[in-house]
Amino acid sequence: MKSLNNKVGFSSLNISIVLLILMISLLARYLVSLNGYSGQSKPPMFGDYEAQRHWMEITTNLDIHQWYFNSTDNDLMYWGLDYPPLTAYLSWVFGKIGEFIEPKSMELFTSRGYETDSGKLFMRMTVIVSDLFIWLPSVWFFVKTFYKQRNISQQISAFLFISLQPGLLLIDHGHFQYNGVSLGLGLFAITFIIRDQQLLASFFFVLSLNYKQMCLYYSPAFFFYLLLSNFEFTLKFSKIFSSIFKILKIGIVVIFTFILCWIPFLSIEQASQVLFRLFPFARGLYEDKVANFWCFISIIINVKNLFTTDQLIKICLILTLVTMLPLVYGIKRIPKNKFVFIHSLINSSFSFFLFSFQVHEKTILLVSLPISLLILHHPNMVWWFILISTFSMFPLLFKDGLVIPYFAIMILYIVIGYQFKNSITRSNNQFKHQNSQENLLASSDKSFYSIYLNYWFYLNIIGMVVCHLLYQFAPHPPHLPSLWLLLVCNFSFIHFILTFFYFIKEMTTFSPIKIKSN
């Protein structure tokens, strides 16, 4: 136990610092949770808060084989379960606890739209507890692994920056979701990759996929990294056999973990129904307006009218796969490199968000995670991207009545984060002289895009303020009801696409710096 504590860094921290970090993290979540949420007091469908509560109701009251099927007891048109089995299992656990604490909150049918103060407190606490046991430990584990050569103050700064991302706070503890669970499981997988513990990485990544299918955004990066880092292109039989054996072990772990998660749903009937619920292509190219490529070009070309749904699915698939080719090149060029791997996650998740079929505005959180992990290497870029990604979700947060916490968090983030990133930049100037392995990354923020951010920062802040004012107060032209919404989305998209190309350039021009195995 002592050696394990030393590895993850707990022994180097004073207990008071640990408690202070936890207090700050939990207090921020609690304060956000005091505000509105998705669909509050808006019958008959309410919103995501009711969806999560309803899943607890369904899993608590119905047999497990009825969870994903339409029936008189389970109307799939009313927030039918459409997440993978681990979400259902966690809903069952929370549902049983909720049933014990407040039975009426989980009664079948009669609990629809249940919004008592005690019920809301319980629901909010389930998200906070999930963060406490999954998201926050995963961030700390990553920081102590990836930034092990940094001093403790830099590690704490990185932990707070990653764990207190405004977008994730507002969506999970305001709007109401459990993204911290899927992202936390995914981050454990990322950290185990960095530690060269690939079997554990595979196990945790499959868990993240089985909690939320959107973690597929990371799957190409994991697949090609694991494949290309283990397979040696050689004519020696012994090395070929060794490569195949390594890949086979990973495959066994992946299959075993999937089977473990899907045990109740392994019949053809059950599995096909669950998959049908997980991938609802009938919903269309995107829901509402989202800051991606398809929404951007819709102001010029209405692709929904030009192509059928099947054609759009194929076009999206081709474009998404083509824009992922840089990650294959990057990993093949420098295999087993921690920086290339994180950049490949950025490439993969960005390609899905910008070009794939059926994208939600909240899925930008999947892009924000790998980008935020590079905070001590790209402080300017990371700080600005997290700001823009949160801004891109403003229309959704406005609809949820989260304007006050949104502006409070954004202002704090701009003021404190601006000073914070400058402090990191100064620390990097000292650190790069001490560690030749990370010299390139520590100084890589001195790029064209960094200069762009520094000189155009105030102009873009003004642009964001104008977008906010127009969206909230200016009447839209009668024939253009989505004008201000499109303005917010397209303003965000321009920054997203620039960031996308920036990190592709970084990944494909790295010097061959090899990561040392822990």
UniProtKB/Swiss-Prot annotation:
<feature type="transmembrane region" description="Helical">
    <location>
        <begin position="247"/>
        <end position="267"/>
    </location>
</feature>
<dbReference type="InterPro" id="IPR004856">
    <property type="entry name" value="Glyco_trans_ALG6/ALG8"/>
</dbReference>
<keyword id="KW-0325">Glycoprotein</keyword>
<keyword id="KW-0472">Membrane</keyword>
<protein>
    <recommendedName>
        <fullName>Probable dolichyl pyrophosphate Man9GlcNAc2 alpha-1,3-glucosyltransferase</fullName>
        <ecNumber>2.4.1.267</ecNumber>
    </recommendedName>
</protein>
<feature type="topological domain" description="Cytoplasmic">
    <location>
        <begin position="148"/>
        <end position="173"/>
    </location>
</feature>
<feature type="transmembrane region" description="Helical">
    <location>
        <begin position="368"/>
        <end position="388"/>
    </location>
</feature>
<feature type="transmembrane region" description="Helical">
    <location>
        <begin position="8"/>
        <end position="28"/>
    </location>
</feature>
<feature type="topological domain" description="Lumenal">
    <location>
        <begin position="417"/>
        <end position="450"/>
    </location>
</feature>
<dbReference type="Pfam" id="PF03155">
    <property type="entry name" value="Alg6_Alg8"/>
</dbReference>
<dbReference type="GO" id="GO:0006488">
    <property type="term" value="P:dolichol-linked oligosaccharide biosynthetic process"/>
</dbReference>
<feature type="topological domain" description="Lumenal">
    <location>
        <begin position="195"/>
        <end position="214"/>
    </location>
</feature>
<keyword id="KW-1133">Transmembrane helix</keyword>
<dbReference type="GO" id="GO:0042281">
    <property type="term" value="F:dolichyl pyrophosphate Man9GlcNAc2 alpha-1,3-glucosyltransferase activity"/>
</dbReference>
<feature type="topological domain" description="Lumenal">
    <location>
        <begin position="505"/>
        <end position="518"/>
    </location>
</feature>
<comment type="similarity">
    <text>Belongs to the ALG6/ALG8 glucosyltransferase family.</text>
</comment>
<feature type="topological domain" description="Cytoplasmic">
    <location>
        <begin position="332"/>
        <end position="338"/>
    </location>
</feature>
<feature type="transmembrane region" description="Helical">
    <location>
        <begin position="396"/>
        <end position="416"/>
    </location>
</feature>
<feature type="transmembrane region" description="Helical">
    <location>
        <begin position="215"/>
        <end position="235"/>
    </location>
</feature>
<feature type="transmembrane region" description="Helical">
    <location>
        <begin position="451"/>
        <end position="471"/>
    </location>
</feature>
<feature type="transmembrane region" description="Helical">
    <location>
        <begin position="127"/>
        <end position="147"/>
    </location>
</feature>
<feature type="transmembrane region" description="Helical">
    <location>
        <begin position="174"/>
        <end position="194"/>
    </location>
</feature>
<feature type="topological domain" description="Lumenal">
    <location>
        <begin position="360"/>
        <end position="367"/>
    </location>
</feature>
<keyword id="KW-0328">Glycosyltransferase</keyword>
<feature type="topological domain" description="Lumenal">
    <location>
        <begin position="268"/>
        <end position="310"/>
    </location>
</feature>
<feature type="glycosylation site" description="N-linked (GlcNAc...) asparagine">
    <location>
        <position position="70"/>
    </location>
</feature>
<keyword id="KW-0256">Endoplasmic reticulum</keyword>
<feature type="topological domain" description="Cytoplasmic">
    <location>
        <begin position="472"/>
        <end position="483"/>
    </location>
</feature>
<feature type="transmembrane region" description="Helical">
    <location>
        <begin position="339"/>
        <end position="359"/>
    </location>
</feature>
<dbReference type="GO" id="GO:0005789">
    <property type="term" value="C:endoplasmic reticulum membrane"/>
</dbReference>
<feature type="topological domain" description="Lumenal">
    <location>
        <begin position="29"/>
        <end position="126"/>
    </location>
</feature>
<comment type="function">
    <text>Probable dolichyl pyrophosphate Man9GlcNAc2 alpha-1,3-glucosyltransferase that operates in the biosynthetic pathway of dolichol-linked oligosaccharides, the glycan precursors employed in protein asparagine (N)-glycosylation. The assembly of dolichol-linked oligosaccharides begins on the cytosolic side of the endoplasmic reticulum membrane and finishes in its lumen. The sequential addition of sugars to dolichol pyrophosphate produces dolichol-linked oligosaccharides containing fourteen sugars, including two GlcNAcs, nine mannoses and three glucoses.</text>
</comment>
<keyword id="KW-0812">Transmembrane</keyword>
<comment type="pathway">
    <text>Protein modification; protein glycosylation.</text>
</comment>
<feature type="topological domain" description="Cytoplasmic">
    <location>
        <begin position="1"/>
        <end position="7"/>
    </location>
</feature>
<feature type="transmembrane region" description="Helical">
    <location>
        <begin position="484"/>
        <end position="504"/>
    </location>
</feature>
<feature type="topological domain" description="Cytoplasmic">
    <location>
        <begin position="389"/>
        <end position="395"/>
    </location>
</feature>
<feature type="transmembrane region" description="Helical">
    <location>
        <begin position="311"/>
        <end position="331"/>
    </location>
</feature>
<keyword id="KW-0808">Transferase</keyword>
<feature type="topological domain" description="Cytoplasmic">
    <location>
        <begin position="236"/>
        <end position="246"/>
    </location>
</feature>
